[in-house]
Amino acid sequence: QWRYDGNQANYNVSPENEFSNKHTADMIARSVRNGWMPFYPQFNENNFSLYKDAEKNGAKNDDEVKQFVVDKLKSKELQYSVADPDAEENFPRVWYIWRGNAIMSSAKGHEYFLKHYLGTHHNSIAEATAKDLVKDVNWMENAPTGKMDLIVDLNFRMDTSALYSDIVLPSASWYEKADLNTTDMHSFIHPLSAAIPPVWEAKTDWQIFKAISKATSEIAKTHFNEPIKDIVTTPLAHDSPAEISQSSLQDWMTGECEAIPGKTMHGITVVERDYTKIYDKFNSLGPNAKNGLLGAHGNSFNAGDFYDQLLENKDHLQTIDNVEYPSIGQDEEVINAILHLSSLTNGELSYRAYKNAEKKTGLKLTDLAEGSRNVKLSYSDLQAQPRRYNNSPIWSGLMNDGRAYAAFTYNVERLVPWRTLTGRQHFYLDHEGYIKFGENLPTYKPSPTPKLYGELD
């Protein structure tokens, strides 16, 4: 779709500068290399081969492998896939679709999906306009069409994505499976129950994923029969020190600063993959849930003892290489593991999360969980009676004594800082990027016209 876009300044009234006059594709390329957003595939070279090249060039540990990658990126010997998205080596060939109509309503630019992803009939009438506008992203005169070799859709609807897929895996509908559902409209937890078994060849989503993982592990015994090292790039994360690592918008690629992983550029991590173990890992809850911290939105807690409780149920265990793990191979096992280890449904874990929040804020907060420390919900509890969430610092509402959920009552009434760099809510954003785009204050801007979008012949 980027091929049919003009410069960003064409669509919005913005101050005149190097940011607002940049093409969207160039901006995305910069965002990826500076660590502002993810993009996969990562490079124009295979990740596994890249690791082996690092070893051949003398890299003896993970840090030296990372430096090898940085040096190749700086010299431009190694290129980002995002900088040449139409090159054969830079786009995937297999597309799994789940929980969304990706080829229709979820696709902004539906006609371009039909043209370039599928190579089928389309109603695209816009002319490609980006040739003389992109600077960092390579322009290919004849863009590939039909990039995908295989599209697999998990679906119980015959929607647009299913109609255009090579394989449709029939998924169970809402009344044929055990599942959990939530909404931002109220604070109750929805348990989905199977009124009837999945019909004909249908399976639940979880069982379909399980079957895919099993087939993948079997194939891996031929193609990846032993562990292999992978190189993974990750963007700078919210709720981490990296969040404040770039006080100004400098680009290491243009020499404005040094390329430092996790600071001036994306993170680089070496990960060991064992593709023969995917099925085993899919069916079992691994030790990181016990030994690490769980949580979200800057709040965390240890749940090691509750992980051990899952191991006490001998009917729901997986034994892998003579080690026992909690089983999550069946739908209800997954649901109960989630409920058991969530601060929203396990009152003791909510208390621990507030305890950790006290250390960060210096405020007294554990009283918010005192009344529910003995609450521990299971799937059968939810089926028997509607249940609400516990209070939890993961969300900003307070729901004591049947109170209706209202966002930010936690911040207003308990003086807990907002989840921003300053801890305050902001009407004005004193941020270099927002200022350059003219978005530092909320200002009305009319929608672009169909003519600007190239929708008129």
Give residue ranges: language-model regions.
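A cross-kingdom feature strongest in bacterial/archaeal respiratory oxidoreductases
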Residues: 1-201, 246-457
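Stable alpha-helical elements in mature extracytoplasmic
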Residues: 113, 205-208
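Flexible, glycine/charged-enriched surface loops at secondary-structure junctions
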Residues: 128, 222-229
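Charged alpha-helix within mobile-element recombinases
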Residues: 205, 217, 233-236
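Non-catalytic, well-ordered alpha-helical segments in soluble enzyme domains
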Residues: 207-222
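A glycine-rich phosphate-binding loop feature that marks nucleotide/adenosyl-phosphate handling sites
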Residues: 226-240
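C-terminal segments that line or cap access tunnels to active or ligand-binding sites in enzymes
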Residues: 239-247
